């Protein structure tokens, strides 16, 4: 979701969408878009650039306002909206406090985390207090990319969503896996946005990394493939015959979820994604039903009601 007050906050902070496009969002427009594409329910989230623009107190206030709105939308339109809580990272005390409020008081469905915060990727020791609490709660965590500081220094003219986003998610996934955080915090259900970035395409490369280099944990290939199957993956901007076959080789089939990236990606892309899933080679009716609905019902049991 991208309510007016949130868009104004990141504009005032000098931020912009990585596509350069203007974004429109209201609950009514969301419902119209969902109805037009046969979408029964959306799990809303605040994605990049998050809510922390340099001031801890302001970030706490903005996170609270976003999360309370998300809860309000779920109450106003029951069965149509759920939500992932946004946290005021990298400020850890505020993030832990908001996590408790959002999950215990507001009853949100999980948490969205950027792949990196203040230059530190998920799996970094500095973020372990948060992962420990998420693990204790067996939380669902959507991992969404951002623009790592290093991406801004590359000198490439292309919008960040085209390449830097998928690399950012991939870096976080690799760090979670090879740092051991994915195993240490095994109760967390991590969803990787955008089909896991480039992870499906380089999964075999990752599996032979221990054979090539002493700098990575000396694990057998199957342990690495099993780690990659522990992630959940959404299909935002990768629901085509180009990408889905690779994703289906890497992910457990019951851990692939439909994602749209709307409103940052236009509604036309949502329609193309739905058609792409139908037409992708190897996607059976059963697998398509899982991606479009059944897998989400397993991840969010409350939706059964």
Segments and roles (model prediction):
Residues 1-41, 68-76, 97-101, 188, ...:
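Mid-to-C-terminal alpha-helical segments outside catalytic/metal-binding sites
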Residues 1-25, 148-169, 206-230:
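Active-site gating loops and adjacent loop-to-helix segments of metal-dependent hydrolytic enzymes
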Residues 7, 52, 151-158, 196-211, ...:
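Histidine/acidic-residue-rich catalytic or RNA/ligand-binding cores of hydrolases
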Residues 21-25, 51-52, 89-95, 118-125, ...:
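Acidic-and-aromatic substrate-binding clefts and catalytic sites of carbohydrate-active enzymes
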Residues 44-179:
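Active-site gating/metal-coordination segments in enzymes
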Residues 140-143, 147, 167-178, 182, ...:
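Conserved N-terminal glycine/acidic-rich loop preference
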Residues 166-170, 181, 187, 211-212, ...:
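Active-site-adjacent C-terminal substructures of enzyme catalytic domains
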């Amino acid at each position: 979701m991208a309510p007016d007050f949130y868009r104004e906050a990141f504009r005032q902070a000098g931020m912009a969408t990585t596509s350069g496009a203007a974004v429109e969002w209201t609950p009514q427009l969301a419902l119209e878009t969902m109805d037009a594409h046969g979408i029964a329910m959306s799990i809303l989230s605040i994605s990049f650039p998050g809510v922390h623009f340099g001031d801890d107190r302001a970030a706490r206030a903005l996170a609270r306002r976003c999360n309370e709105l998300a809860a309000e939308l779920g109450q106003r339109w029951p069965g149509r909206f759920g939500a992932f809580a946004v946290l005021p990272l990298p400020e850890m005390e505020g993030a832990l406090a908001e996590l408790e409020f959002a999950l215990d008081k507001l009853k949100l469905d999980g948490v969205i985390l950027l792949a990196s915060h203040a230059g530190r990727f998920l799996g970094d020791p500095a973020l372990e207090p948060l992962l420990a609490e998420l693990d204790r709660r067996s939380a669902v965590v959507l991992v969404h990319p951002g623009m790592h500081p290093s991406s801004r220094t590359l000198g490439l003219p292309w919008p960040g969503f085209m390449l830097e986003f998928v690399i950012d998610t991939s870096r976080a996934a690799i760090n979670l896996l090879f740092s051991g955080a994915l195993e240490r915090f095994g109760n967390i259900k991590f969803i990787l946005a955008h089909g896991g970035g480039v992870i499906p395409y380089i999964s075999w490369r990752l599996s032979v990394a221990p054979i090539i280099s002493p700098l990575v944990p000396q694990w057998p290939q199957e342990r690495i493939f099993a780690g990659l199957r522990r992630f959940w993956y959404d299909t935002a901007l990768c629901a085509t015959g180009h990408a889905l076959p690779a994703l289906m080789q890497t992910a457990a089939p019951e851990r692939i979820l439909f994602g749209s990236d709307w409103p940052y990606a236009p509604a036309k892309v949502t329609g193309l994604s739905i058609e792409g899933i139908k037409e992708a080679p190897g996607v059976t009716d059963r697998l398509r039903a899982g991606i479009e609905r059944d897998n989400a019902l397993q991840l969010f049991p409350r939706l059964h009601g």
